[in-house]
Amino acid sequence: MKKLILSTAITCLSLAHVHAQQGGATETTPSRSEYFSWINNTNEGATAEQTRINLDFFRWLHDKYGMELDIYAFDAGAIDGAKMYGSTKSDRFKRQFPEGFGPLSRQAADMNTRLGIWCGPDGFGNSEAEAKDRADMMTGLVKDHNFGLFKMDAVCGQLRKDKYEPFDSMMTEIRRLSPDFVLLNHRLDLGPGTRHSTTFLLGGEETYIDVFMTNSMTAPHHRAQAISRKAPENLTRLTEDHGVCLSSCLDYWEDDLILQSFGRELILAPEIYANPWFLRDEEFPYLAFIFNLHRTYRDILVNALRLPEESYGPEALSRGDDGTRFLTLRNLSWQPVTYKIKLDSETGIIDNGKKVKARLYHPYIYDLGSHNYGDIIEVEVLPFRAALVKLTTQPEKDKVALSGIPYHIINDKAGDDVEIKLLGMPGQTYKVKAEKGNAHFASAQINGNAANALARGGSARVSFPGKPFKEFYHRLIDRMQSCDIPADAPSLYYATCYAADNNALEVRSLARSGETEIPQVKAARDAFTEQEIFRARDLWDRYLFDGDESTCFSVKLRHGDRRAGNTSALYLDLGKSVKLDELVFKAPDEYAIAPYKSQEGALLWLSDNLVDWKPITFIVGTKAVADTRDAGEFRYVRLSDSPLRLSEIEGWRDGKAVDRSKWHASNLFREYNRGGCKTRHAWKSEFTLDEFADGAYLCVALNGHHGREGAWAAMKVDGRYVGCPDRAPSFTSNTWEHLNVETDSNNTYYIPLTPDMLGKKLEVYALSFESPDLKPEVW
């Protein structure tokens, strides 16, 4: 018997013509959902075992939430790689896939998923035999393993003109085998074979946040630029936008995916890549919800209508048919925006004599009522967020449709029971009513308590604990005022150096997500962090404290020395004040300790409060021991020049190694007063907060031009220094792939608010090392 299961969660919210199919699809072909593995691996390529684990993750989403994935695509390195062509007969391929693609294609097929692969357009060699081998291999992927997609990329190389004919012939055979085969063309001239291309890369943009796509404006999160992306001018769907990257800077990924799936809604949608297993456990139901909602309506989402920007905001679109439309709205400003939505032909709805039902589907589901055709309703969109609104005159497709309260669907596809999370503000009571859905239930419960009236179409009252907020949780607190350079400017600077880190962006995502209780998620995360190439790139400060001298943490120089001022210090935070007899620094070789040389003296700086620093002289070497027994208690350690590469940092007390589980280090931030890092202008804001929501944070928006790494922010709480652990664009990092984007304007620093800050005097500072023309604000 079906059961309706509801749980409550306090939240902060505001209501608010067919052509020949030469390329495998037409403008009216429904989208296919895709994941591709770029950033899960880089040009070294995937392996069979890692792919098996990743497919297990998607099988879990399929079985748990009913999520359908049409295509799982290997990215670079599986066969072809950057500037090279490969073969399934090569030793390299056999090392990566000892049993070939067969087991993986069968594993994918068990959940109705087809494999795809990144490749180059050529590889036909210089003889007829070599050309035949290439064509047979690529055709065999489709014939023998039911591959459904090739992503052909100029990174591998262009197609030679004398190979136009074998390419065209190969793709003609593939189209015969699989008429719906998808060929993605990334920056390639394929000659006559261009007719086989399904899509072309939209704007040439990749979407790896803060590597290839980063904010150009101040914003409360890292994905403001991503949600600013435009749809193709002619609303073509036969292009590819590189999907949504789930690897770095994950907050508000769902807005990004809503706009990709329901806004641009290209032939590949929803399209994600990299490391979706980095999401928090509680976010996976929403990932599945977006995929499932899109799949339910994908046949009609192919029809698009631009909405007037003056009424509906930037890049607003309506998709659907005469009876059902989905509107994607966005707000690219710091204040909430209310849009007036006309329930008529302006939004694509055609009058059939029935009421128009309006329902918000993102950022949560909320019933907006039934209205007469031609009415106008208002929908509020939160700052730097997206909204998805459904208008329909048709019967409800949702199994459950509630009114009176915002909610998320946790699971309505797998199994008989439907699970809903009710959302509410602290101290508020809601009257929840079950509207007519397309399923019938024998019972209902809220937080384990019977609420069977809901199953019969009745109502229930739901109250949320806590006190109602006096003010809207998102608000401007202050426009910061210019002030004298504070005497403790170095301490403020160091507070953020110690609060932040230089780990790979993926490591930061793991820290955001916390531990998982889902075996398939843990396996996929571990498969990523334990892959040999990730460990070998020295991207994680954890390697300094793991007791394994074969792992290291290094200053990344692969793309040259990109440190501000070409200098950086080593910062070590012990997590709490301690007394130690010795600090031991280990390096793998003499080169690694540069710019130091063995048997030279150096100074180590120790502090308990970021104000008073005690120098300790020690002798440099591949194993350097600093005697700290007379230093008293300290928490913060600073070495003016960071060694290029360290394998371990140890602490000893009474002959025993101390616990280092709370230690962390960074190696890319300058020391104050070096490399141009000196405060020339300052701004301050002082205030007290008597209320804020759980998970709240301050945004210090540095509006204006400040130069590359030319401005900083931090806070004092009743005199205690509190740094910013995050910033958009991201703090410089030892990146997993490519490099951090560098910007010289409009950085936004983030400071988490904790319960101990309530009622305390908060002093927020912005420090500029260059420009006096900033207009900082605190939100």
Kindly give the residue locations of the regions a language model identified.
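Aromatic, loop-rich ligand-recognition surfaces of beta-strand-rich domains
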Residues: 20, 548-612, 626-671, 699-705, ...
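Active-site-proximal substrate-binding groove within the catalytic cores of carbohydrate-active enzymes
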Residues: 171-172, 177-366, 372, 376-388
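Short beta-strands within extracellular/lumenal beta-sheet-rich domains
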Residues: 311-317, 554-577, 588, 675-691, ...
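Surface beta-strand/loop "capping" patches
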Residues: 303-324, 395-428, 666-691
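C-terminal beta-sandwich/jelly-roll accessory domains of carbohydrate-active enzymes
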Residues: 322, 329-527, 532, 536-550, ...
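Aromatic- and carboxylate-enriched substrate-binding clefts and catalytic-loop regions
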Residues: 68-254, 648
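Conserved structural scaffold segments of CAZyme catalytic domains across common CAZy folds
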Residues: 21-116, 122, 268, 274-309, ...
